A protein has these predicted regions:
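Conserved PLP-enzyme active-site core in the AAT-like
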Residues: 1, 22-25, 30-36, 41-213
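A glycine-/small-polar-enriched, mobile loop at the entrance of the PLP active site in fold-type I
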Residues: 1-22
Length: 213
């Protein structure tokens, strides 16, 4: 509270602030880079968008029109959680098409392999007490299969208080809730591979504009 009160009266260069935040997030998560966004839900939208567009500004400005882009996002049926809204709704906000696979309480690796295709842009993995408690593919195995097909893995860990271990388990992009973990104002944290973090942050040139912090 004292830190917030101390900085509020002063003007801040937001780009510089995000650079400082990136270093702090990288240190806290073990990721290469990171930034702060409006909330974790926003983080899902712009992370999916990043996996579809990369740093292509024309594609970024065109979303949610995904013509010519890989635009499918796979997710285990047992990970289709509702945290006030369905996670699949946030994925679709980017313009992506959701591909659910497996059953509510049981998913096999062969089903993930079958769900991945030429149009797959990303795979979403949820770590939460809201997700199916058993029967899901483990994150390391999930990531191994996706990476073998060149598909990045987005991990929604908004329900978690610990931020370590996800990069080592195979996450390419990580999403956390700042207010849950830090007790601060509503905000989301995006962390991960530097190239994907840059692409996610660049979504402020398009659909991510109303989601920036």
């Amino acid at each position: 509270v004292e830190a917030v009160a101390g900085i509020l009266p002063h003007p801040v260069d937001m780009a510089e602030l995000q650079q400082v935040a990136s270093r702090a997030i990288a240190e806290a998560t073990g990721a290469e880079a990171g930034f702060v966004t409006g909330c974790t839900s926003a983080g899902i939208v712009i992370s999916v968008a990043a996996c579809m567009t990369g740093l292509d500004l024309a594609a970024i400005e065109r979303l949610p029109d995904t013509g010519g882009l890989k635009d499918e996002v796979v997710i285990q049926k047992g990970h289709v959680v509702n945290y006030g809204s369905l996670i699949t709704g946030d994925i679709r906000l980017s313009g992506a098409r959701v591909v659910e696979f497996g059953a509510a309480l049981e998913t096999g690796a062969y089903q993930l392999e079958a769900a991945l295709g030429e149009k797959t842009a990303a795979a979403v993995y949820v770590v939460s007490h809201h997700a199916a408690p058993t029967g899901m593919i483990s994150l390391p195995h999930f990531a191994e299969i996706c990476h073998a097909r060149g598909v990045p893995v987005i991990v929604d860990a908004a329900a978690e208080y610990g931020w370590r271990g996800f990069v080592e388990a195979g996450a390419d992009l990580l999403l956390f809730s700042a207010q849950k973990a830090l007790g601060g104002l509503t905000a989301g944290v995006v962390a991960g591979r530097r190239d994907l973090v840059r692409a996610a942050h660049a979504q402020s040139r398009g659909i991510g504009r109303p989601m920036k912090a």
